[in-house]
Each structure stands twice: as C-alpha cells, then as structure tokens.
Amino acid sequence: MSWKYDVVVVGAGIAGPIVARNVARAGFSVLLIDKKWAIGTPKQCAEGISIKVFEKYDIPYDKRFINREIYGAKLYSPSGYELEMRYKDVSGVILERKVFDKMLAYYAAKAGADVLARTEALDVIRKDGKVVGIKAKHEDEPIEIYADVIVAADGVESTIARKAGINTYAPPHEFDSSYEYEMLIEGFDPDLIHLWFGNEIAPRGYVWVFPKDEDRANVGIGINSDNPQTAKYYLDKWLKENNIPAKKLLEINVGVVPVGGFVKELVKNNVLVVGDAARQVNPMHGGGMAEAMEAGTIASKWIVKALEEENLSLLQNYTKEWWETDGKRLEKVLKVRRVTEKLTDEDLDLFIQVLSGADAEKIAGGDYGEVIKALLKHPKVLMSKRRLSLLKSLL
C-alpha cells in the first residue's frame, strides 16, 4: 500500500503537530504519523510551560489540558536559602500532556492534515539517490508514504533524520536522565513551581515539584546521564531526606533530555528535523516545549514558501533563520549551563542569596549580560578568583 502527500511529518509530540497544522492551513496535503497507540502517552515531561505560548503560537487556552495556573517559582539552594519569583498574574501553567499533545494533533486534523496513530516510520525511500518518502508500518501493515517534504519530529532517537543523512549524534554526557513521580504531596505552595539545586541533591540538574493540584504534583529530577548512580536513586534519596513519603504514586515516568548542544544542519535536501530530534531544548532547565513550537513555526513557514514557489532549496532558510534567532539565544543559555556545571554548593548558596527573581529569570533565558556585570561587583565574588573567572567567561 502506498500514499502520496505534499508533506509527511513523523512524530506527534509538540513540534510535529505545529508543523502539520500550519502547512495544512496553507492548503497543502499533510500526513502526521506517530508510532504510539495513543498520541501523548507516555509523558516524559514535568508539564510546565509559559502562559505566553498560547497566544504566540495560536493554541487555544483550553481548560481540558490545563491542570493548574502558576504564578511564579521558588528556588532552593543546597543549604536551604530561598529565592522566590511571584507575579500578580498567571505566568505559566501545568499541562496534562496526555491531553495537550492529542489536542495539538486534533488541531492539525481540523486544519486539514491526516493523522495516524500507531504508525511507525522505519526508513526513508530513495530514488536516484534522493529521499522521496518513508517506509512505515500502520497497525503492523507495511506502507510506503511518498512526499515532497519529510519532517523528522520523532524525538531524541530520530530514526528518520539519521536515515536521511542528518548528523544528530551527540555523546552520552550531553544528555540528562530524568525520573519523575506524579504523586500526592503536601507542604508546598501550589501556586509556584519549586526547584532544588545542589551537587549532592541533583548533580548537574535539579529536583522539581510542579503542582497539578493542591496536593498532587509532578515530583522529579534531572541529572547527568553518565552519573554512576541513577536519577531514581537521587530522587528517592531527596524524598527520604525531606521526609516525603513516596507511597501515593499515581504515575512514574522516565526520560532522556538533550542538554549539550543542538543539531547544526537542520535540513538535508527535502528532509527537516525539528524539536527534540534536533535537540532544540533549553539546556539550562531541560524544557523543550516552547522551543519545539518555535522551531515548528519557523520550519513550517519555509515549507509553505518552498511548496508555493516549487523551490525546495528554500527549505535551507529554516536552518539559517533558526540559528539566527532561537539558536542564537539557546547558544547563550548553553554557555551559562556549562558555567553552572562548575559551581560548588557554596557558589549556589551565594548566588541564590544575592540574585533577585528577575535576575534569575534573565539568566535562565540567556539575557544575562547586565546581571553578570552586577554580580562581578559583589564582594564575595571579587574575593574569589575562580568565581570572577567563571562569570567573566560569560561576557
């Protein structure tokens, strides 16, 4: 069995449905496929996202996939110093990813795209040396899907990007391992997300509590994947040390997060790679939903232009525009990440004491120049050659 579309999108996480919806809206035939039996499961995410994405990426603010509105964040240092960022208005939400992802695919379908769950991409189809489609299986039946443009939105492992000749390789140390419980938990302000830092708490990462209800939250951890201990070990250790019983677990999720850099060439002829498949993730906190939406938006713009003008070479502009915009920002964030990996617990204590909430937000977003300059004037920074050197490396 074979089908023909203008565009086939492999993967219905975040980036894939955004691309499929936008291209279908422009009047082109699109097929969005996902290997899972139910789009959106299992989740591999803490489910928090900025309130700004709904308007920016034209996504309905639908209470069906919003668990809780969030008004800020609270950061905790290794010794227990706290930094709170609290806003009058809603700053973010905790999603229900199992519903959210499915609704993104629904919006793509409503825009005109065909959507098929339980359809796994296996390989690319080549003709005269060019990629002309993909081999897949739909409900265990082999199919061939021919398309002018193929979009690899198939996650960190990205079979299709690799098969098409896009270099997506990254060494193991450029990934973090995550482990998360959705569980009943009390004693934390449910209007804030909570983050704990420390080299003994979460090496190269942090522990999070993202409230989904008054007494229910995603409680998870991210650590360097080459750590001799597992993420589960550190999370269970943190729960025990904080006298938090782990006896009311509603869901357990594990994941791998690319945090060490981004795929350089995002296009190979008529094949594009987006989202986690392109490692388009904020390396500071490991979140990638907003980044996937941005990449999907840029990619879909150039797909539409290339198809309208019947000039697939225009697809190369996706790589160019992404690196000039979000890629440039994320490279700055990666620079911060690499510095934070060298911080001692004493450093983390100091910075959480002296930074304001606005400062912390700027650093996490890559807009840190003025904040670093101010820190360089702090007496405890001036007295340490090592701290001075680390901070100056960011300027």
Curated annotation (Swiss-Prot):
E.C. designation(s): 1.3.-.-
Residues the record lists as binding a 2,3-bis-O-(geranylgeranyl)-sn-glycerol 1-phospholipid: R329, G365
Cofactor, free-text remark: Binds 1 FAD per subunit.
Name of the protein described by the UniProt record: Digeranylgeranylglycerophospholipid reductase
Pathway field: Membrane lipid metabolism; glycerophospholipid metabolism
Family matches, as SUPFAM superfamilies: FAD/NAD(P)-binding domain (SSF51905)
Pfam family, one: FAD_oxidored
Family, per entry: Belongs to the geranylgeranyl reductase family. DGGGPL reductase subfamily.
Positions that bind FAD: A15, D34, C45, A46, G48, R97, A121, D276, G288
